[in-house]
Amino acid sequence: PISTNIVQRPVVTGVTALGLDHTAILGHTLEEVAWQKAGIFKPGVPALSVEQPENAQAVLQKYAKQVQASSFQVVPVNRDLLHVNLGLPGDHQYSNASLALELIRTFVLSDTGKQRFPGASEKLGCTGASVPDLARVALSSAFWPGRCQVVPAKEAFHATYYLDGAHTVESVRVCVQWFVRETAQNKQPKVLVFNCTNGRSAYFLLDSMLEELKKCKVDA
């Protein structure tokens, strides 16, 4: 697999939601992408993933077994997180946050984690299932410019910008859902500024956007 392997000896590895991206390198199906992404899994190292489409998840699990990862775990959404106001908008971020918590939990409970950060498991409350206070603060204050970002209107322009760097069919759908929620009470005219970089299909991205707008009963 052609995966990004910056850390040669990881303590734990994780894969977030898969989508069709960089298809010239990663492949043209979700299963091919999963195989390439699974390249970060290492022998004797726990392998984690968010819930994926069935076929893609099977590929991840197969690769984890092939390289003899110490375990393969599918991390569901942590229900306790649903009461946390995440800094990054979007329902999918609860899945990402759940994976992040499990990665941290696995790390601090490992031999390496205990050696480098003694007492961290107690401070972070990693022995329980609830979300520790420190994690709540971190997740609620997280900010990623260009991801579901709102730039408020200035008096001179009278225009509020809703920015997102979605570049896959899946992330475009999530972007539309976020935008519709954010502007539900805003009856002002809306203008779409769309940019597509080389190597991606503007047709499929825009088609996905229009489909989602129709589902949300928004005229486009």
Where are these regions (language model features)?
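Internal gly/pro-rich beta-alpha loop/helix module
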Residues: V11-V12, A24-T106
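Nucleotide phosphate-binding/pyrophosphate-handling subdomain across enzymes
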Residues: I2-G14, L18-H22, E32, L81-D219
